Amino acid sequence: MLIIPAIDLKDGKCVRLKQGRMEDDTVFSDDLVATAQHWVNEGARRLHLVDLNGAFAGTPIHKPVVEAIAKAQPELPIQIGGGIRSLETIEHYLEAGVTFVIIGTKAVQEPEFVEEACKSFAGHIIVGIDAMNGMVATDGWANVTDVKATDLAKRFADAGVSSIVYTDIARDGMMQGVNVEQTVNLAQYSGLPVIASGGVTNLDDVRNLKGQLGILGAITGRAIYEGTLNLREAQLLLDENRL
């Protein structure tokens, strides 16, 4: 299991939002390549990048920055989400050195697109499921749908999806702990590996996720930037064979 640092990109800076509200942001850095290098130095084995402007615009806005990070970290697996709505965009990112591309809104609006992407780019597609009270949200979390997160995950069980990134919006950026029950439920219901996101605040949250069936990793943002979670300590905890 991996602890995966999040680098959220907004207006060329690394920020953290609260519950996805673009106006409620905290800027942590304006040197994104250096931020990525910092987390690598701290022991990161994968990076999670989100183009926040892209998520709202419906098209990538931070392509050059993502390319620069990928070029600076050629051996590091990188996953990117936000505004990915075409096969051309996926191809562009993979050719630039990104390892995994996260499809979110488009997965809800056009599930066939995910299946097509999995056929074209096998092993490189992650579905991002963002949910408020168990219901899927789209377009940078601006719209909450009537689609259940578990039903959407099940829809892609046989599509060839690499994994699911599951974000509990109510917990995201709020430092209130991770929703272990819903995350594990999603993994068990879908049969797909799940990366937990939203609310990973301290080592207790990491302990609660450790050993849970189907949990591939946990994304953490505000906690590692504000210091309530030490990335290296968290990964060491997960690497131990004991709880």
Swiss-Prot record:
Q: Where is the active site?
A: D8, D130
The reaction(s) catalysed by this protein are:
1-(5-phospho-beta-D-ribosyl)-5-[(5-phospho-beta-D-ribosylamino)methylideneamino]imidazole-4-carboxamide = 5-[(5-phospho-1-deoxy-D-ribulos-1-ylimino)methylamino]-1-(5-phospho-beta-D-ribosyl)imidazole-4-carboxamide
**Where found?**
Cytoplasm
The EC designation for this entry is: 5.3.1.16
Keyword check for Cytoplasm: yes
Do the record's keywords include Isomerase? yes
Major subcellular site? cytoplasm
Q: Name one GO biological process term.
A: L-histidine biosynthetic process
The alphabetized UniProt keywords are: Amino-acid biosynthesis, Cytoplasm, Histidine biosynthesis, Isomerase
Pfam families with a match to the protein in the record? His_biosynth (PF00977)
Name the InterPro entries on file: Aldolase_TIM, His_biosynth, HisA_bact_arch, Isoase_HisA-like, Isoase_HisA-like_bact, RibuloseP-bd_barrel
Q: Which GO terms describe its cellular component?
A: cytoplasm
Q: What's a Gene Ontology MF term here? A: 1-(5-phosphoribosyl)-5-[(5-phosphoribosylamino)methylideneamino]imidazole-4-carboxamide isomerase activity
Quote the pathway field: Amino-acid biosynthesis; L-histidine biosynthesis; L-histidine from 5-phospho-alpha-D-ribose 1-diphosphate: step 4/9
Family indicated by similarity: Belongs to the HisA/HisF family.
Q: Which HAMAP family match?
A: HisA
Protein's UniProt name = 1-(5-phosphoribosyl)-5-[(5-phosphoribosylamino)methylideneamino] imidazole-4-carboxamide isomerase
The organism is Acinetobacter baumannii (strain SDF)
